[in-house]
Amino acid sequence: MTTAVGTPGSAITQRVHSLNRPNMVSVGTIIWLSSELMFFAGLFAMYFVARAQANGNWPPEPTELNLKLAVPVTAVLVASSFTCQMGVFAAEKGDVFGLRRWYFITLLMGAFFVAGQGYEYYHLVHEGTSISSSAYGSVFYITTGFHGLHVIGGLIAFVFLLIRTKVSKFTPAQATAAIVVSYYWHFVDIVWIGLFATIYFVR
């Protein structure tokens, strides 16, 4: 007579497999992100209205956007979507160590993006482009600033998730939380690609 013996890791994996089916948390997150999409659509509309009403150069002098900084910073943020998804794959397998590793890397990459954005803000303000200096300054800081706040919100979510998986046993609920955070992070990345293309290339 044979007795099947299961390991804790395999038990977690079996329970986590159920996460591939839609659940209320995931559906609720997708609905919320849809409302966030409408919010950013309004910001894009504001930017294009300001651009249409502007006379002369866009952006106006003395604004000089730092494309050489923006490109690598953007590349890092886009790459962070891939590291985030690797964390999701680990969570779906019940691999908490892989989840922590990939999400910590994603956290560092997101922090790099925020630091890069802050660096560009510093130089723009130093050169005379502030939120009150022109219509361009207003729409630039409002659109990128709200996106930056969303990135910071994602970083906070990563920190809480990493702490949660460290101080307690890894559960399907934590795996669900990891997947939900990934939805948010992918959304933030996609929004930035649109903002980057609009701000740095639409003249």
From Swiss-Prot:
Reaction(s) catalysed by this chain's protein: 4 Fe(II)-[cytochrome c] + O2 + 8 H(+)(in) = 4 Fe(III)-[cytochrome c] + 2 H2O + 4 H(+)(out)
Cross-referenced Gene3D superfamilies: Cytochrome c oxidase, subunit III, four-helix bundle
CC terms in the record's Gene Ontology section: plasma membrane
Keywords: Cell membrane, Membrane, Translocase, Transmembrane, Transmembrane helix
Bilayer topology term: Multi-pass membrane protein
InterPro entries: Cyt_c/ubiquinol_Oxase_su3, Cyt_c_oxidase-like_su3, Cyt_c_oxidase_su3-like_sf, Cyt_c_oxidase_su3_a-hlx
Name of a matching Pfam family: COX3
Entry annotated with the keyword Transmembrane: yes
Main location: membrane
Alphabetized GO MF terms: cytochrome-c oxidase activity
GO biological process entries: aerobic electron transport chain
Location in or out of the cell: Cell membrane
EC assignment: 7.1.1.9
Transmembrane feature ranges: 30-50, 69-89, 102-122, 142-162, 179-199
Family to which the UniProt record says this protein belongs: Belongs to the cytochrome c oxidase subunit 3 family.
Entry protein name: Probable cytochrome c oxidase subunit 3
Gene name tied to this protein: ctaE
